[in-house]
Structure formats: structure tokens, C-alpha cells
Swiss-Prot record:
Pfam families per the UniProt record, alphabetical: Dzip-like_N (PF13815)
Gene expressing this chain: DZIP1
Region (Mediates interaction with PCM1): 12-203
Composition bias, Acidic residues: 722-733
Region (Required for interaction with DAZ1): 154-278
Signal peptide interval: none
Tissue: Predominantly expressed in testis (at protein level). Also expressed in fetal brain, adult oocytes and ovary. Expressed in undifferentiated ES cells. In testis, it is specifically expressed in germ cells (at protein level). Expressed in mature germ cells and secondary spermatocytes, while it is weakly or not expressed in primary spermatocytes.
Name listed for the protein in its UniProt record: Cilium assembly protein DZIP1
Residue numbers carrying Phosphoserine: 226
Length: 867
């Protein structure tokens, strides 16, 4: 009970600490107690807001009743507590709650009630009154809930009735749906079958087969059936006639359609062909337009690139000018700061101060703003330039790759072409070799019939052992002329005996090997001539060589458009080339042998060229000495004259076959150098005539003027073709000029003549003239070795022209004569061709430039000869 009472008190509906009691109902205390119990039970599960209607204002009632002491004394409290007698409490609750105890006094002492006890009793009365009010409220709530429950029960009953009714309706609807579904399925079957059901013409019925329909008609439509049959037959006949007409029309329309279809097919084919041709023309135009646009784009890009480069150069120049101006301004500022005068007082300094400081500040701000603006603009231009440069570089790289592909394709074509031409050249070379062999057989026959020269061998030895006397200058005095007159005939006899009286020797093994090498050189020269005759092939080879060189340089990290590289990069490239060379040495077993063989070939060619040039120099020197050393008339005895004539004729006859052999073996004579005079000029013919008259007639001989250095340069640099042609012409014209032919001996004889004289009669302080000319001709031969390769090397030719002009200018003045004794004349004879001070320096410079130009010339010569 205590727990129930606690729950009951805890669930009382307080509203803002104010309770609103309801009016007491007419029920008695029993009903109230039952209602209180029911209310307590319902409040345990219902929320306080479940009460409906406004809550009345609660207020405690005044205590006006007196205490019924007799009834109270009659109640046994222990019994009520033990039996839980609620009814007794209900009977006395009103008297206890609303009695007034303030006026009550003790019957014995007549004293009033203790105030604390009175307070306790009053609180208990208030509590009971509140509990009564709560009981009334709960009872009213219970009544409302019961009413609502009753209404809900009524609604439930009605809902049940409605559910049963709807269930019946649903059942009937399901049956109707099943029936209609079956009907729809049958109709669908009939619609799908089409001819499987038969519709009655007189009613709406349909049947699954014809028998059912006939039975239906006979049973239901007997009279109508006969009339229908008649109509049906008439309709059938009408339909048949219409069908025949329609078939004819169909046949006619079919033929017309076929003709129209054929015509349309022909028209479509023609239109398709026209459209195809138009598309092809359009594609060609489009490709052409695309190429034109590409070319325009490339041109525009080049123009834009040039414009940007110009702007960049202008900006750089402006920037450098501004930097220079800034540096000048800074220097001037430093000078102004350093040139401060004497110190002044404060008032003087204020007086001297500028009256416009604000303007200066504004100008400085304006300059700063302009500088920032220009720097920003320059940075923007730099960024745009970098972007444009990157785009152009990418486009250039694409174009370069495409060009490399095209060049590779053209290289393959040219390689095949070169192989074909090489085969043809090989066949022609074989034919030429056979013809040369036949010519050699024809020319070798006269060598076997040559007889030994007539004369006394002791006289040859005497002539050869005596040294040659030096030349006498033109302006020497008469005394020296008389002293040397007796020795002049002997000198000239010795000079001509050295040319005429040497015996003819057979060809040695070295000369035979040299002839074989000359044949190979002639074959290679024929190849070079064939390449020169076909200029397009030479240009193609040149482009191929340039392309290969560019590719090799690019593989080594050197671009083609670079003008120079640093030393570090050069060392790196040389290291890479050296490593590649070592790699090739490891891959090729006979690498060193091949290299030595090639070096030997090149050195042999250079030596051969040098020997040929030295031979020409020796012949020219002997011509010069023979014409320049005869100062007076010479009276030769008749015996000596006859001996000279005999030896000249025999020597000329013996030397002709070898010269002719050389001429016939060289079908492609070399071009003469640009600094030489044409062969057989009028001056040389005049000199030869003078020599012939001097040595053939006993009369007086006029002294010719001394040859200057310019004429010597002309005579010393003659080609092989000049020498061979001169030999042939002089051989044909043998009888009128025997002595003149004897002067031009073979070059091998002159070369053999100089070594045994080189250290015999050379005076102290003199210069060996033949050795000097041999060295000089070696240098000149390096220059003129590849004159025929003009397409490959133009720079060396230009240097030769300039060198020839310079040497011609320097060598125009004749050597000055001196009135000295005979020993001085000997020194002058040996040092006649020794250049002096400034001329020697010019010669050295010419030699260095010649050597520099000959480096390229020799390499080109070796490359073209190996092709």
C-alpha cells in the first residue's frame, strides 16, 4: 500500500505548482473510493495531458467544523491499520480534514493546543484536502477514458462489419476477374489464330471450326443462309474479275517499275562516279591547300622568328645602352660625391638647397614607376619569346626528323645509283686497262733496239768529274771577263755533257713499281673524271657526305649551325672519338694493317708528286742556267761540235720511247696550275732558238738578258702534260734543232746528276741551289697536287693565285751586280736564288699558308682517288 500511495502521489498532475480541483461528484464515498482506486490505476499508464477540458483553480477551503471527539474515540487505529480498513478512513476523512482545532482546549488544564502540533495537524489537513482533490480529478479522467473506450469499441464493431462486407465484395470481384481473364485469353487465342475461328455472318457468335458454324447456321439461320449463298457467289465472281484486272495492272506496273529501277540505277552509278571524281579533285585541292598553308605557316614562322630576333636584339642593345648610361650616371654621381667642396654653415646649406625638392621626388617616383613598368614588359616579352621559341623548336625538330627521313630515302636511292655507276666504271676501267696493256706492248718494242751511245767513255767520265763553273754577271768588268773567257767553253761543254753524255740505263724495279702505281693512279683519275663529268652525281655525293658528316657531328654532340666549340667540349669529343676508334680496333682484327696501308699509299702519292715537281724544277733550272751563264760569244772546235751533235741525237733517240710511254699511259693529263704560263710560249721558243744558235754555229753569240725570278717561277711549275707534249714535239722536229732537244733531258737523269755534286764543289757560305729548288717544289707540289679537284677545293686555288701574284711581284727585279773578285762571283752563283730579308719572310708566310691549304687538298685528293 505504501508503494502504491507513493506512486499515486508521484503521478499527481501539478501545473506550475498550482492544482485545479474538480467539483465533487454526486457519488457516495464508496463510489469515490472505487473511482480513486481506478483513477490511481489509470494514472499510472495515462499521461497528465490526457485530461480534456480546462482545469479549475484549486484553493484550500476554510476550517469551520468542530471535532467529533466521540467518533474519533470510537475508532481503533491499530485495527484499521492491521485490516487496512479504507472505508473507516473514508467515513471520517471529511471531519478530520475540515475540522477547526485552534479553539480546542484541554479539558483538564484548559490550555490551548501546542502551536507545533497545531501546525502539523494543519499540514496534514491540507495534504488530505489535496489528495481528495486529486482523487476527484482522477475519477473524472477515468470516466472520460471509459467513454472513449466505449466509443472505440463501437468503432471496432463497425469496422468488423465493414471488413466482412468488403471481403464478400472482393470474393465476387475475384470470380468476375477470373471469368474475364479466361474470356480475354480465349479472345487472344482466336485473334492469334485468325483463321481458326469462324464468325457467324448473321450474329455476333464465333466458332472454333467450320462444322460448328454450319450447324449453327442450319439451326439458327436457315432462311437467311440461302439468300447469303446467292450473294456470296455473286460477290465471288465479281472479285475474280477484279483480281484478273488487278493482275494485269500489276504486271504492267511491275514492268514500268523495273524500267524505272534500271534507269535510276544507271543514273545513280553516273552520279556516284561524278561524286567520286569530285571528291578526288577536292582531296587534291585540299592536299595542295594544306601544303600551301604549311609553306605559308613556315614562312610566317620564319618571319615571326626573325622579327622576334630583331626585337630581342634591339631590346638587348637598348638594355646595354641603358646599362651603359646607368653606369655613366653612377660614375658621375661618384665623381659629384667625391668632388664636394668646403664645408658650409647650416644657414648657408639651407640657402643653397634646391627650391624644388618636391619636383625632384616626383621625378624619382615617375622614373621608378617607368622602370617597374618596363621591367614588367620586358619580363612579359621574355616569357612570350620563350614560349614562341619552344614552339618553334618543337616544330623545327619535327621538320628536321621529316627531312632526315627524306634524306635517308634519297641516300638509299643515290647509293643504289652509285653502285650501278661503279659497276659500269669498273667495266670501263677493265676495258681501259686492256687497251693500256696493248699500248704498253707497242711502246716497249723500241726499247730493245736502242744501241749504246757513241763516243769515248773516258771523255764522259772527264766531263762528269769536272765541276760546273759559276755564272758570270752581265755588268762585270772586262778584266774579269778576259780571265773567265778561257774557262767558259769548258764550262758549257761540261754542262751539256752532263745533259747529253749520260748513258741510258734500263728501268729499275722501283721505276717499274712506280709505273704500276701510275697505272692505278690513272685508273683512279679516270674515276674522278667520270664523277666530274656527271655533275648531278657529284652534287648528290656531296650532299650525302655533308649529311653523313652532320649526323656524325650530331652524334658527337655538335650541332651543324655552331661556329665554334670550347676546349672542354673538344676534349670530350676527342675522347669519344678515341674510344670509338679503339672499339673499331677491337672489332676489326687487321685495323692497323689497313691504316698503315692507307698511310703508305698517301705518302707514296705525295712523294711521287714531289718527285715530279722536283724533276720539272731541275729541267727548268738547267734551262735557266744554260741561258743565263753564257755572257759572251763561244767558239767551239769542230770536233767538239760534231761530238755534241752526235751525242745529242743519240740521247734524244734513246729518251723518246720512255717519254712517249708516259704520255700514252696518261690518257687524262693533269690541268696546268693557274700560276704557270701556257706551254710552248713565244718567249720559250725564242730562248730555245737562241740556245741552238749558240751551240750549233761557230759565230758570235749575243748574251741574253738574265732570267729574273718571275720567269723562273713560270718555268719551274710546269705540269706533266707540258713536259710530255714538249718531248713529243721536240722529237718530231729533231733535225733543225738537235742541241735544243738535248737540253731537256729526262727528269730522272737530272735527279741523278745532283746528288754526287751536292757536297763536292759547294763553296763556304753558299747555298745548294738544286736542293733548295727541290724543297720549294715540294711545297708547291702540295699546293698544286689537286688542281684538277676544283669542285672539291676552291680555297687552295685562290691562295695559289694570290701566292703566284705575290711571288711574281717580288721576283721582277734582277739581282744587283757587284764589282768583286772571282770568289765573290762564285758566292753569287751559288746564292743566286737565295731570297733576302723581307723576301725570305714573305716566302715563309707563303709556305705556311700553302701548307695550311694543302692539308685540305691532300685529304680531298685521297678521298676522291679512293672513290
Amino acid at each position: 500500500m505504501q508503494a502504491e500511495a507513493a506512486d499515486w502521489f508521484s503521478s499527481m498532475p501539478f501545473q506550475k505548482h498550482v492544482y485545479y480541483p474538480l467539483a465533487s461528484g454526486p457519488e457516495g464515498p464508496d463510489v469515490a473510493v472505487a473511482a480513486a482506486a481506478a483513477g490511481a490505476a489509470s494514472m499510472a499508464c495515462a499521461p497528465p495531458s490526457a485530461a480534456s477540458g480546462p482545469l479549475p483553480f484549486f484553493q484550500f477551503r476554510p476550517r469551520l467544523e468542530s471535532v467529533d471527539w466521540r467518533r474519533l474515540s470510537a475508532i481503533d487505529v491499530d485495527k484499521v491499520a492491521g485490516a487496512v480498513d479504507v472505508l473507516t478512513l473514508q467515513e471520517n476523512i471529511m471531519n478530520i480534514t475540515f475540522c477547526k482545532l485552534e479553539d480546542e482546549k484541554c479539558p483538564h488544564c484548559q490550555s490551548g493546543v501546542d502551536p507545533v502540533l497545531l501546525k502539523l495537524i494543519r499540514l496534514a489537513q491540507f495534504t488530505i484536502e489535496y489528495l481528495l482533490h486529486s482523487q476527484e480529478f482522477l475519477t473524472s479522467q477515468l470516466h472520460t477514458l471509459e467513454e472513449r473506450l466505449r466509443l472505440s469499441h463501437c468503432d471496432g464493431e463497425q469496422s468488423k462489419k465493414l471488413l466482412t462486407k468488403q471481403a464478400g465484395e472482393i470474393k465476387t470481384l475475384k470470380e468476375e476477374c477470373k471469368r474475364r481473364k479466361k474470356m480475354i485469353s480465349t479472345q487472344q487465342l482466336m485473334i492469334e489464330a485468325k483463321a481458326n475461328y469462324y464468325q457467324c455472318h448473321f450474329c455476333d457468335k464465333a466458332f472454333m471450326n467450320q462444322a460448328f458454324l454450319q450447324s449453327h447456321i442450319q439451326r439458327r439461320h436457315t432462311e437467311e443462309n440461302s439468300h447469303f449463298e446467292y450473294q456470296k457467289n455473286a460477290q465471288i465472281e465479281k472479285l475474280r474479275s477484279e483480281i484478273v484486272v488487278l493482275k494485269e495492272e500489276l504486271q504492267l506496273t511491275r514492268s514500268e517499275l523495273e524500267a524505272a529501277h534500271h534507269a535510276s540505277a544507271v543514273r545513280f552509278s553516273k552520279e556516284y562516279e561524278m561524286q567520286k571524281t569530285k571528291e578526288e579533285d577536292f582531296l587534291k585541292l585540299f592536299d595542295r591547300w594544306k601544303e600551301e598553308e604549311k609553306e605559308k605557316l613556315v614562312d610566317e614562322m620564319e618571319k615571326v622568328k626573325e622579327m622576334f630576333m630583331k626585337e630581342f636584339k634591339e631590346l638587348t642593345s637598348k638594355n646595354s645602352a641603358l646599362e651603359y648610361q646607368l653606369s655613366e650616371i653612377q660614375k658621375s654621381n661618384m665623381q659629384i660625391k667625391s668632388n664636394i667642396g668646403t664645408l658650409k654653415d647650416a644657414h648657408e646649406f639651407k640657402e643653397d638647397r634646391s627650391p624644388y625638392p618636391q619636383d625632384f621626388h616626383n621625378v624619382m617616383q615617375l622614373l621608378d614607376s617607368q622602370e617597374s613598368k618596363w621591367t614588367a614588359r620586358v619580363q612579359a616579352i621574355h616569357q612570350e619569346h620563350k614560349k614562341e621559341k619552344g614552339r618553334l623548336l618543337s616544330h623545327i625538330e619535327k621538320l628536321r626528323t621529316s627531312m632526315i627521313d627524306d634524306l635517308n630515302a634519297s641516300n638509299v636511292f643515290y647509293k643504289k645509283r652509285i653502285e650501278e655507276l661503279g659497276q659500269r666504271l669498273q667495266e670501263q676501267n677493265e676495258l681501259i686497262i686492256t687497251q693500256r696493256q696493248q699500248i704498253k706492248d707497242f711502246t716497249c718494242n723500241p726499247l730493245n733496239s736502242i744501241s749504246e751511245p757513241k763516243g769515248n767513255p773516258l771523255a764522259w767520265q772527264a766531263f762528269e768529274s769536272q765541276p760546273a763553273a759559276p755564272a758570270v754577271p752581265m755588268n762585270a768588268p772586262a778584266l774579269h771577263t778576259l780571265e773567265t773567257k778561257s774557262s767558259l767553253p769548258m764550262v758549257h761543254e761540261q754542262a751539256f755533257s752532263s745533259h747529253i753524255l749520260e748513258p741510258i740505263e734500263e728501268l729499275s724495279e722501283e721505276e717499274k713499281g712506280r709505273e704500276n702505281e701510275q697505272k692505278l693512279n690513272n685508273n683512279k683519275m679516270h674515276l674522278r673524271k667520270a664523277l666530274k663529268s656527271n655533275s648531278s652525281l657529284t652534287k648528290g655525293l656531296r650532299t650525302m657526305v655533308e649529311q653523313n658528316l652532320m649526323e656524325k657531328l650530331e652524334t658527337l654532340g655538335i650541332n651543324a649551325d655552331i661556329r665554334g666549340i670550347s676546349s672542354d667540349q673538344l676534349h670530350r669529343v676527342l675522347k669519344s672519338v678515341e674510344s670509338e676508334r679503339h672499339k673499331q680496333e677491337r672489332e676489326i682484327p687487321n685495323f692497323h694493317q689497313i691504316r698503315e696501308f692507307l698511310e703508305h699509299q698517301v705518302s707514296c702519292k705525295i712523294e711521287e708528286k714531289a718527285l715530279l715537281s722536283s724533276d720539272q724544277c731541275s729541267v727548268s733550272q738547267m734551262d735557266t742556267l744554260s741561258t743565263g751563264e753564257v755572257p759572251k760569244m763561244i767558239q767551239l772546235p769542230s770536233k767538239n761540235r760534231q761530238l755534241i751533235r752526235q751525242k745529242a741525237v743519240s740521247t734524244d733517240r734513246t729518251s723518246v720511247p720512255k717519254i712517249k710511254k708516259n704520255v700514252m699511259e696518261d690518257p687524262f693529263p693533269r690541268k696546268s696550275s693557274t700560276i704557270t704560263t701556257p706551254p710552248f710560249s713565244s718567249e720559250e721558243e725564242q730562248e730555245d732558238d737562241d740556245l741552238i744558235r749558240a751551240y750549233a754555229s761557230p759565230g758570235p753569240l749575243p748574251v741574253p738578258p738574265p732570267q729574273n725570278k718571275g720567269s723562273f717561277g713560270k718555268n719551274t711549275v710546269k705540269s706533266d702534260a707540258d713536259g710530255t707534249e714538249g718531248s713529243e714535239i721536240e722529237d718530231t722536229d729533231d733535225s733543225p734543232k738537235p742541241a735544243g732537244v738535248a737540253v731537256k733531258t729526262p727528269t730522272e737523269k737530272v735527279e741523278k746528276m745532283f746528288p754526287h755534286r751536292k757536297n763536292v764543289n759547294k763553296p763556304v757560305g753558299g747555298t745548294n741551289v738544286p736542293e733548295m729548288f727541290i724543297k720549294k717544289e715540294e711545297l708547291q707540289e702540295l699546293k698544286c697536287a689537286d688542281v684538277e679537284d676544283e669542285d672539291w677545293d676552291i680555297s687552295s686555288l685562290e691562295e695559289e693565285i694570290s701566292l703566284g701574284k705575290k711571288s711574281g711581284k717580288e721576283q721582277k727585279e734582277p739581282p744587283p751586280a757587284k764589282n768583286e773578285p772571282h770568289f765573290a762571283h762564285v758566292l753569287n752563283a751559288w746564292g743566286a736564288f737565295n731570297p733576302k730579308g723581307p723576301k725570305g719572310e714573305g716566302l715563309q708566310e707563303n709556305e705556311s699558308s700553302t701548307l695550311k691549304s694543302s692539308l685540305v687538298t691532300v685529304t680531298d685528293w685521297s678521298d676522291t682517288s679512293d672513290v
